[in-house]
């Protein structure tokens, strides 16, 4: 597939590397489909040679979405991947067979987070829609829930989950032009809900870092895609309905 480029994060599991392709040009809208997801074994098949050529095996082909900056998430013997068109695919890494697919019908640019405690994957797609999908022990994508984090804009970030809450950022409008937000969503009940959002000066496109600060409190660290390129945080607790944006570090000078 020489017309496309490998521009996805590598995922290593079960002695294999998994990765996908995207357009070889810098044009995001380049319709160079189909795009594919591959696997390569890392075993030393010929110990008499200092190097050897490996064969890329195609596992998934997408005619609508790319795998640009996409990273597979390991769930035991399975790996779940997504393309930018909103199709999720479960792969059994023992035989590299697809066990299930799910089309959510929304553009999906970020990556997936897995909560092992609840067996749920989380991601944001479309107009700031936070999804949670249960994954069964036999590699099937099951019950789906979602909640809209903000009514305008979008998010291409990867959420973080801790203790029944999901933390994720996005844009309220156009990226790098309009205000951004950091959202805290409760995913512990049957119906997801947004506890609150904190307005940011611009789009925050990063996976937040969660640090436990007490029995029922955490600190959420993240960056904002805007000058001066600082590090920021909010403090969240069990029953919080709001938070104050804190500046942790901002560079000065040129």
List PLM regions with ranges.
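Loop/turn-rich, solvent-exposed surfaces of beta-rich toroidal or solenoidal domains
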Residues: 170, 201-213, 219-232
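Short glycine/acidic-enriched loop and turn motifs that connect beta-strands
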Residues: 23-29, 86-87, 127-129, 172-177, ...
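Residue position within the beta-strands of beta-propeller blades
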Residues: 19-20, 81, 123, 168, ...
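Repeated scaffold domains used in trafficking and secretory/extracellular systems
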Residues: 3-11, 64-74, 106-116, 152-161, ...
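A short beta-strand motif characteristic of beta-propeller blades
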Residues: 1, 51-63, 97-103, 142-150, ...
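Short coil/turn segments that connect the beta-strands within blades of beta-propeller domains
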Residues: 14-16, 76-78, 117-119, 163-165, ...
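Short loop/turn segments that connect beta-strands within beta-propeller blades
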Residues: 41-47, 92-97, 134-139, 186-191, ...
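A short loop-to-beta-strand structural motif that recurs across blades of beta-propeller domains
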Residues: 33-38, 87-89, 129-131, 180-183, ...
């Amino acid at each position: 597939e020489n017309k496309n480029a490998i521009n996805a994060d590598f995922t290593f599991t079960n002695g294999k590397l998994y990765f996908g392709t995207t357009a070889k040009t810098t044009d995001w809208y380049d319709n160079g489909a189909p795009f594919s997801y591959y696997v390569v074994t890392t075993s030393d098949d010929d110990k008499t040679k200092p190097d050897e050529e490996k064969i890329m095996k195609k596992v998934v082909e997408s005619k609508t979405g790319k795998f640009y900056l996409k990273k597979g998430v390991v769930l035991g013997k399975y790996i779940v991947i997504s393309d930018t068109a909103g199709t999720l695919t479960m792969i059994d890494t023992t035989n590299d067979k697809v066990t299930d697919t799910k089309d959510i019908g929304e553009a999906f640019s970020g990556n997936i987070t897995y909560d092992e405690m609840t067996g749920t994957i989380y991601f944001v797609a479309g107009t700031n829609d936070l999804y949670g999908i249960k994954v069964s022990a036999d590699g099937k994508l099951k019950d789906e829930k979602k909640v809209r984090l903000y009514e305008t804009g979008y998010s291409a970030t990867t959420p973080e989950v801790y203790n029944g809450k999901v933390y994720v950022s996005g844009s309220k409008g156009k990226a790098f032009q309009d205000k951004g937000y950091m959202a805290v969503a409760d995913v512990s009940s049957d119906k997801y809900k947004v506890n609150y959002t904190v307005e940011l000066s611009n789009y925050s496109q990063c996976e937040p870092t969660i640090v436990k600060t007490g029995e029922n409190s955490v600190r959420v660290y993240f960056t904002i895609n805007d000058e001066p390129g600082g590090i920021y945080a909010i403090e969240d607790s069990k029953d919080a309905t709001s938070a104050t944006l804190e500046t942790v570090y901002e560079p000065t000078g040129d």
